[in-house]
Amino acid sequence: MRVKVDPREVAKEFADFSRRMQKGRELLDKTRDRDVQIATTPKREVFRRDKTVLYRYEPVAKKTVSVPVLVVYGLVGRYTMADLQEDRSLIRNLLAQGVDLYVVDWGTPTRGDRWLTLEDYIDDYLDACIGQVCRESGLDAISLLGICEGGVFTLCYAARRPERVKNLVLTITPVDFHANAKGAPPHHGLIGLWSRSLTSEDIDRLIEANGNLPGELMSFVFSLMTPVNALTKYNLGLFDVMDDEKKLLNFLRMEKWLQDRPDHPGEAAKQWLKDLYQENQLVKGEFRLGGEKV
């Protein structure tokens, strides 16, 4: 099969490519860290225990909801995803609606946190943060917004301490960890497929070798959900946006969040992978915290 190539079109495409490359180089050259800051919504620290910090956001509108909302993200990422940038921010949207908003920051676990369990995070740190919000609001119960792994934390907490939870909202939260086992598209539930491909001893060796579950490893596993994008985003994907400053900064902010995935404390990671992903104990009613069924 012959392909006709118009030299004039080739020259035009090459000139356009060169122009975009030059514009992209200029934009990258002038971009500074302050231009790609994330989680910039004003807030103040109101409570701290070990590395866990509770923040309260500054109100921007008249309060329309009497019950404050505590946002709880997981340990496999950072809460900053909920406040990525001014025009793409769950936090700013909730504040604009008059919600009294708090967020939990789990900090950056190190090898010194290797022995922390899910009980430590749910029954101690999360419980302490909820207690602080209750004290500040003068209420006995508050609303919880759980995101990803944080949704499992809040779900377990609500099941064990229902008197402290007025409303529970979950988003992108796994409950049936084997829901993808049959009939789901290949890219759905990849973390579950990966974790179930490991033996219990594999997980033990992984944690013992590293102390924690490495954030870099989880970033790689997540990237396998969209392998083509993972291979092309730094060439084709970046090229598509590099001459548009707004799109380029959006791209860089997302990459900044993706590359800042903290390690997951070792013992808590064992529970997360074994009890939940491998054995699906939560939906079976077999999951235990502190020796008690959730």
Where are these regions (language model features)?
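Alpha/beta-hydrolase active-site loop
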Residues: 115-136
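Alpha/beta-hydrolase-fold enzymes
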Residues: 1-13, 135, 139, 154-267
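N-terminal targeting or regulatory segments adjacent to alpha/beta-hydrolase or S9 domains
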Residues: 1-39
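Gly/Ala-rich beta-loop-alpha elbow adjacent to hydrolase catalytic centers
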Residues: 145-150, 154
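Short, surface-exposed "cap/lid" segments of acyl-processing enzymes
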Residues: 32, 39-110
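Conserved catalytic-core motifs of eukaryotic protein kinase domains, centered on the activation segment
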Residues: 113-115, 181
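Alpha/beta-hydrolase fold catalytic core
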Residues: 27-52, 238-294
